[in-house]
Regions:
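Flexible "arm" and connector segments at domain edges
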Residues: 1-46, 51-174, 178-254
Length: 254
């Protein structure tokens, strides 16, 4: 990387700020590779992500801030501090409680990236609160909270017409509902963002199959009524269930 910075004009002019989009993009591509289950692709994408780490380290080194050895050394020290039961005489404690003590956070959200996606942010906030004991005993607590929040959301939607009584209040209640769902995910060992990614992929897959079925009948979804579209949706779900019974495809999902 030092050689590239010296000899390549494009590499030479890059800064931490100009490299930000590439770092974010490479992280997403690693995530896609993991979801795809292809080890060769994952290997290549991890290399691209590592390149970004090296790039930022050399940029920092050039301005006398730190270098790659400093990055690696800080990581080793951090891992030792987080595992005192392995590398010291300390007892095993929760990751969040150790981080809070080490960094002496003054607020719950201190240190969380400003650009962290909302589902990830909710999960991390709840993890941090749990690290100091502010948490449900088990999944029954957040499950009851989800039911409570659904009722509060319904209070702002007219039961006859579906009209919204107070848009701002509804937004607040929907936020509470989403936060409760994330908490339920966390207490059951599911990451809300991954669960939603799975459902997004399922919806895209089923919608594409709907379009194919309609096209095979000489129709377009854009010209069909909702009832007709639902008929194709049900056909897709029935085909998936049939595929599951034969053991040749997707799992059964609603």
């Amino acid at each position: 990387m030092r050689d590239l910075r010296a000899r390549c004009e494009w590499d030479r002019v890059q800064t931490h700020q100009s490299l930000r989009p590439y770092l974010i993009e490479e992280a997403h591509e690693v995530d896609d590779a993991i979801a795809g289950g292809d080890d060769a692709v994952l290997r290549d994408e991890l290399g691209d992500l590592l390149l970004q780490v090296l790039f930022h380290s050399v940029v920092a080194e050039e301005r006398g801030a730190f270098g790659m050895h400093d990055v690696a050394g800080a990581l080793v020290a951090k891992m030792h501090a987080r595992h005192p039961h392995l590398y010291g005489d300390g007892i095993k404690r929760s990751w969040e409680s150790m981080k809070a003590q080490k960094t002496k956070r003054s607020t719950l959200e201190e240190g969380l990236p400003a650009g962290l996606p909302s589902l990830h942010r909710a999960h991390r906030l709840q993890d941090r609160a749990a690290g100091v004991g502010f948490d449900w005993d088990n999944a029954l607590g957040p499950l009851a909270k989800v039911r409570e929040e659904i009722a509060e959301v319904a209070h702002h939607v007219d039961a006859e017409t579906g009209a919204v009584h107070d848009q701002d209040a509804l937004e607040a209640e929907l936020g509470d509902l989403l936060f409760a769902v994330v908490n339920l995910c966390r207490k059951t060992g599911v990451h809300g963002a991954l669960a939603l990614d799975r459902t997004n992929a399922k919806f895209v897959r089923r919608y594409a199959l709907m379009e194919q079925l309609a096209a095979a009948d000489g129709k377009s979804l854009t010209t069909l009524s909702l009832d007709e579209q639902d008929t194709y949706w049900d056909r897709v779900k029935a085909a998936e269930r049939a595929g599951e019974s034969r053991g040749d495809g997707h799992t059964r999902e609603s």
